[in-house]
Amino acid sequence: MRRALIWLSSVVVATGAGAQGPPNTDVYLAPLTIEGGRPLIGPAVNVTHRIGYDNQPSFTANSRAILFTSVRDDGQSDIYRYDLTTKATTRVTSTPESEYSATVMPGGKRFSVIRVEKDSTQRLWSFALDGSHPRIVIAALKPVGYHAWIDANNLALFVLGRPNALVHTDVRTGRSDTLARNIGRSLAPLPDRSGFSYVHTVDSASVLAAMRWPARASRDLIALPRGSQDIAWASNDLVLTASGSKLLFWHSGDSAWSDAADLSAAGLTEISRLAVSPNGKWIAIVTVPK
């Protein structure tokens, strides 16, 4: 039985028979609109609604489904799909290995995952959208914790180490180089595809930064609220994050975060990962159920 687990509250993968079980988390889905530059969050619906680990949501390219990581009764970590129209959940991968952090690749025909292999090696793999035809994306680079596609040929990767490193890899050549160190798990392409964002530690604070590509010009944007480590881009100049039961937003040029919504009345607490659909109409929210 596979025991490799990526924790919600950590930026490393814990493996081995002695590892504790994964945290109990759920994925919620809510409508998202932007009015006057302010994000408005509609009623949030629990789309997983079960005891167990459901986490790491990302939307398909057509915004019609969510891919997410789920650990079920068999103890296996696989990728599942939730269809926004039919509200049906289907299993996408069912392998002897563990798959995490499903991300639809540029072109929309495959998705990439962090795969924990039988010998606990963590590398980047990809699958067809139906979970078939697995193949390795980068053979030499390991252990990979998280990733984001800058474009069809370039990847930004969180590589575990002391300290953790932000590594760029050109998938055409397999060549990799280190861009930064002491980074967090949140990596995301910029909405206009001009680069990507990452979070790194500056004077004990978690700071959101953006790197333009291919210029490799990086600049700090704003410090995240204390305890926050995840963000999602809602538009070219609007970022969302969470603190406790609250969603917060930041506009490019602002000096501080502003409140978007308090979801405590809906039972959403300890909000962590966020994902916004490509069409900007939906937000997926990971929370610890009451």
Predicted regions and their residues:
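Positively charged n-region of N-terminal signal peptides that target proteins for export
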Residues: M1-A4
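Bacterial N-terminal signal peptides
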Residues: I6-T15
